[in-house]
Design a protein with these regions (language model features):
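N-terminal alpha-helical scaffolding segments that mark the starts
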Residues: 1-57
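Canonical WD40 repeat/beta-propeller blade segments in eukaryotic WD-repeat proteins
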Residues: 11-20, 59-71, 107-152, 191-199, ...
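Surface-exposed loop and turn segments in beta-propeller and other repeat-based domains
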Residues: 54-57, 285-305, 318, 426-448, ...
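Short beta-strand elements that form the blades of beta-propeller/WD-repeat-like
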Residues: 399-406, 441, 446-447, 496-500, ...
């Protein structure tokens, strides 16, 4: 297999600035520095994490400072965000737009805190609440005046406390009936700004800090000290200094027995409440002397972030609920089990709270809240905010494949020139890098001698070097307004039509070659012509061109799908997708996040954020089939197989593969036989599946499934074997196991008369062969039956674009 690589993408993910867990604990909202918000589905294992929705940033000065979830009609609740421009916004998770905007009239908002739920308040008991004085200093402040207790009892709506820049704490009420945010009251202003705010568990008081379940107040300061206070008396109980920089975030476990702190030194520290009656167990904790009273002790810390950790939140793994399954379950054979190490799968089970951290390195990590030091954290998002890439393999214009890369506010259209002048014994891999920084790359993707054989690999660590290719030639750059970010984009198979949508409406451009320049190389030789789409089209969540490039299909934020003729620029038809739950309860339609069309132009598949699939017939312009979410999970990738326009291949967040017979409205024969018994190594596939790639051949029976960390070759023409029985106890499928370290030219490989190298076969009879990838992958596609293109970026290069973290001395330097 000939591998071509592109590493010249401008990838700079935004820092994580805020985290918030939904009311039911199954979703986590992530706010980033560029103003975007991601909704992640919480999973009970390393498999199942999925970014369901992404709300793109609005403008450069829109900086989110805090996120909260409030009770609402849905189980997850209502999502609110606070901004440094002094506004509070509620977000519509169906249209992905701002639903309500409220001005604080107090300057920048530094933090929000939501009132605890009624159930929590009923289980909380305090002493001498009636005798407590109102405190208005930096430690605590009463959340109500003496005559407001009766108002609290009669108040049904949930309240939020807002810490404002003018030194005032304001209370707002999230109204259930009017679906609005109403101002409630303000507390007396103090000197300086209010930077943090938190409710007591009984909602009787408001604190400037974090509060855990037993009423203890926890705060952090710029000296790296975590302080524990008596919330009733306002006195400091203990202070622990284990951070080498500012304490930026605090979180507590649901039972109030554990506290986590994060700081600018990249550490996440764990403190545990130990009763004075504790005997032998107290010896392992630091800071607890013999015979001591109740105390907060330092348990330990972990440093997996390279930069400041700015946000912490607690979540509960989702209890997996099986959806409607179309296939018949099959029993798996007994065999040897590989012992799992100290990884995420050992502790991430339903009912166990997990800690999630995010910071300036744009990464998200999950830790076990109850056994913080026992297991390694799990990298939730190996490639945060990856760029969207699309390739036209055989365009009508240019000399090679045309590649479109979507960034936050512009599109780059480039021509990739593929040459095949490779020498025998050299690596069949090309690295396209415009900055000439191919410096002794020691290992990349293992090579194979042919896509059809697909099982003959060589250890790439002994390869000499990469064969450097020609960098992509920039043809055009399409920019949108600075205040409007690009939501989605699409390029036709012919490569001459490009469409994108911002937060206002979709746009269409035509790429033309200017013959007057006398050259077809360079940006000056190409021209862009804007075409006017029909009026009335709103912002789009997803779009795609038909296979013959004659129609543009747009999924708008109203839940409808519009079909536009690109020649006449007329609206041909509007599909109204059928969704069972929506039709029964008259709910808004969830956003459609994926669209794909068949090669023969007959079928259109539209997939929403929850995993529901709608199939439309583009010939008669009618809905053909509705498929409820497969195995109860979201769809991560989908595509029609080129060998048959009636075959739709779908992957879900649980790492299941479904082959659907669209014409017959049923599961394909392969899925009926194998989907319920896929190999264990694929069910534990590293990273979330982000794409499918089919060989462009009508006789092909395979597909490459890839994530940001690995790729897997699946051949639907071969049986599926449970490889766990063939592995020795303790053996794992690693990078070394996928190749032979003793078979290359340096170690005396035989060179046959035909000039080709002889490789040792590995897994020659196996299906579902998994290859790990060294660098985060954004896109992978076939250019031909034996050539693939990989768009990737070394994470070390990305880290250099971030601001430098707090200096940490390395031993021995």
């Amino acid at each position: 297999m000939e591998v071509h690589r592109v590493r010249s993408i401008d990838w700079k993910p935004a820092c994580v600035v805020a985290l918030a867990t939904s009311v039911d604990g199954t979703q986590v909202a992530v706010a980033r520095e560029d103003g975007s918000i991601e909704i992640w589905k919480v999973a009970p294992g390393s498999v199942g994490w999925h970014c369901q929705l992404t709300i793109t940033g609005r403008r450069n000065d829109y900086v989110i400072s805090s996120l909260v979830w409030c009770r609402g009609s849905s189980a997850s609740g209502r999502l609110l965000s606070a901004c440094l421009d002094g506004t509070i916004s509620e977000w519509d998770l169906f249209s992905l737009q701002q639903k309500t905007v409220v001005e604080s009239f107090g300057g920048s908002i530094w933090q929000m805190a939501v009132e605890p739920l009624t159930e929590s308040r009923e289980t909380y008991s305090t002493k001498n609440n009636d005798d407590d004085d109102e405190k208005e200093n930096g430690v605590s402040a009463s959340s109500s005046e003496s005559d407001s207790d009766q108002e609290e009892d009669n108040l049904v709506e949930q309240r939020i406390a807002v810490a404002c820049d003018d030194g005032c704490v304001r209370i707002y009420v999230v109204c259930d009936s009017e679906d609005d945010i109403a101002y409630y009251k303000s507390f007396p202003r103090v000197k300086g700004r209010i930077l943090s705010v938190a409710w007591s568990i009984d909602a009787k008081r408001i604190f400037a800090g974090g509060s855990d379940g037993d009423g203890t107040l926890v705060s952090g300061d710029s000296t790296g000290t975590t302080q524990f206070w008596d919330s009733q008396q306002g006195t400091q109980l203990q202070a622990r200094t284990y951070h080498k920089g500012d304490v930026l975030a605090l979180a507590s476990t649901p039972n109030g027995q554990g506290v986590f702190s994060a700081g600018s030194d990249g550490q996440v520290a764990h403190y545990k409440f130990v009763s004075g009656t504790t005997k032998s167990s107290s010896d392992s904790f630091e800071g607890l002397a013999a015979g001591a009273r109740d105390s907060w002790v330092f348990v330990g810390s972990k440093r997996v972030h390279t930069h400041d950790v700015r946000a912490l939140t607690l979540a509960m793994p989702l209890i997996f609920e099986k959806g409607e399954f179309l296939g018949e379950p099959t029993n798996k054979e007994r065999g040897y089990r590989r012992p799992a190490g100290l990884d995420y799968r050992k502790w991430a089970i339903p009912g166990v709270p997990m800690l999630i951290s995010g910071g300036n390195d744009a990464k998200l990590f999950a830790y076990p809240a109850n056994r913080f030091l026992d297991f390694n954290p799990h990298d939730i998002c190996p490639a945060p905010q990856r760029v969207f890439v699309q390739v036209a393999r055989k365009p009508k214009i240019g000399e090679g494949p045309i590649m479109m890369i979507q960034y936050s506010s512009w599109l780059d259209v480039s021509m990739t020139k593929i040459s095949t002048d490779l020498e025998v014994g050299k690596r069949k891999s090309r690295d396209f890098d415009s900055e000439d920084n191919v410096k002794k790359q020691s290992c990349t993707l293992p090579e194979s001698v042919g896509h059809q054989s697909g099982r003959y690999f060589r250890d790439n660590r002994r390869a000499n070097s990469l064969v450097k290719g020609t960098p992509p030639t920039l043809l055009a750059t399409i920019k949108c307004k600075k205040s409007q970010h690009i939501i989605c984009s699409a390029m036709s198979e012919s490569g001459h039509l490009i469409a994108f949508s911002d937060r206002i409406k979709p746009h269409l451009y035509k790429l033309k070659f200017d013959s007057s320049t006398g050259s077809n190389v360079g940006e000056d030789s190409w021209r862009l012509k804007k075409k006017s789409l029909p009026e009335g089209l709103s912002a789009s969540h997803s779009m795609v061109f038909s296979a013959d490039s004659t129609r543009l299909i747009i999924a708008c934020n109203d839940g409808k799908i519009h079909v536009v003729d690109v020649d006449s620029l007329e609206l041909l038809h509007t599909f109204d997708p059928f969704i069972e739950d929506i039709m029964e309860h008259a709910m808004p339609r969830p956003p459609i996040t994926r669209l794909c069309t068949s090669g023969d132009g007959q079928w259109l598949a539209a997939i929403n954020c929850y995993g529901d699939v709608n199939i439309f017939n583009l010939e008669i312009l009618r809905q053909h089939w509705y498929i409820s979410r497969l195995d109860g999970c979201s769809v991560t990738a989908a595509g029609f197989h080129p060998s048959s326009g009636n075959v739709l291949v779908v992957t879900t967040s649980s790492n299941h593969v479904y082959v659907l017979d669209v014409d017959a409205k049923q599961l394909g024969e392969w899925s009926k036989r194998y989907t319920s018994g896929l190999p264990r190594r694929f069910l534990e596939f590293p990273g979330e599946v982000i794409g499918l790639s089919f060989p462009p051949s009508p006789k092909a029976t395979s597909v490459i499934v890839h994530s940001s960390k690995a790729m897997c070759l699946i051949d639907f023409g071969k049986p599926v074997n449970q490889d766990d029985n063939d592995l020795r106890n303790g053996e794992t499928i690693t990078f070394e196991k996928l190749g032979s370290a003793n078979h290359d030219l340096a170690n005396g490989d035989e060179k046959p008369s035909n000039g080709k190298l002889k490789y040792k076969p590995v897994f020659s009879d196996k299906n579902f062969v998994i290859l790990p990838l060294r660098y985060p992958v954004h896109f992978l596609t076939h250019l031909s039956e034996r050539t693939i293109l990989i768009v990737e970026k070394p994470w070390v290069d990305v880290l250099q674009k971030f601001k430098a973290p707090v200096f940490r001395h390395v031993f021995g330097t």
